[in-house]
Amino acid sequence: MDSYIIEWLNLVVRWIHVITGIAWIGASFFFNWLDSQLTPPENPQPKVEGELWMIHSGGFYQLKKTMISPSEIPRVLHWFKWEAYSTWISGIFLLGIVYYTGSGVYLIDSEIADLSYGMAVSISLGTILASWLVYDFIWASALGEKGWFPVMISFLLLFGIIWWFHQWFGSRAAYIHVGAVMGTLMVGNVWRRIIPSQTKLVEAVKAGKTPEASLGIKAKQRSLHNNYMTLPVVFIMISNHFPNTFAHYFNWAILITIIVIGATVRHFFNLKNKGHLNIWILPVAMAAIFALIYVTKPDATISNSPDTVTFGTEHIPYALVRTILDQRCVSCHSSRPTDDVFRIAPKGIMFDNNERVHALATLIKIQSVTTIAMPLGNKTGMTHEERVILGRWVDEGASIK
């Protein structure tokens, strides 16, 4: 398929994915907050478990949580499910557009694992499917009722999946695939557990029967799981913009840490919504972020040290830098790319003009020296010595004369 069409598909499907994701996560946050804010009605009413008054958009809203009789089933009953389904469907399409087209250029990194295209796609889809099957088995079985034990097992399995993806895929792809796994668990919870429980609830009401209490309990459990996964998934959605995370040597450990921090912050708000203000959680989460920033600080030696650079303390000539860029970068980052996959310069970054190279010097260092995120999968074979030269050139002022 023409790269121009791929680029437009990427844009449109990504836009849909973001829109539906906002709708889904927004609904999740709202209903978790709503359940915690319900209070007994001022004027007690039969079957009304709680109510909430709100003001928004210039009007007053009264919400009631109630059990109803068959005759009271409304003609129109809104189900919150298509937000989840649409997010997952668009996400899977986006995964295919980005990682399965172009012979898997974003998926396969030969320096990590020498995979064929078919093997890479099989690992991708197989792991996503297997993750849901194992997770659902744990929580649908008696094991899911063992208190904190299944929680710890689930965390360990997730951490194992994170490590697993980093053994096979490029770091960008590994991060996004973890997000795909978590998104699949979330939509699986909606599709296979929450909506079926709600369907049985409606059917019981229509039949004049008392709904099984276990249905609501299990659905609420899966909904809570989704609630804790939202912040980590949102981070993963934006992570590809930050190579200081996915391109770090300990990228898998960074992702695990951020997932734990995100779930912890979500826990703070869940407790707060129930009236328990454990304010200490936020400073601890912030301290963890600052610790992560400190621990993952890049090693400065790459731009100062290697024995392979023969210039010593001499000035790095721009002619040498220009040669490196022409050999390693311009095949993609040009007004007329010659790469077999990219027909348009990624992110519109072009190195044809020397003044533009000077303006982009800091970005060049971040991507190719500090994080070693570029060239993508080191497709053009940039050497350690060449990265050192680029880093020193930027440190010297990025002169183009």
Can you annotate each of these PLM segments?
Residues 15-44, 181-197:
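Hydrophobic alpha-helical membrane-embedded segments
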Residues 1-24, 143-186:
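Long, highly hydrophobic alpha-helical transmembrane signal-anchor segments
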Residues 28-71:
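Membrane-interface amphipathic/juxtamembrane segments adjacent to transmembrane helices
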Residues 79, 84-103, 163-176, 229-248:
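Alpha-helical transmembrane segments and their membrane-interface junctions
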Residues 1-11, 101-115, 166-178, 241-246, ...:
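Membrane-interface interhelical loops and short amphipathic "cap" helices
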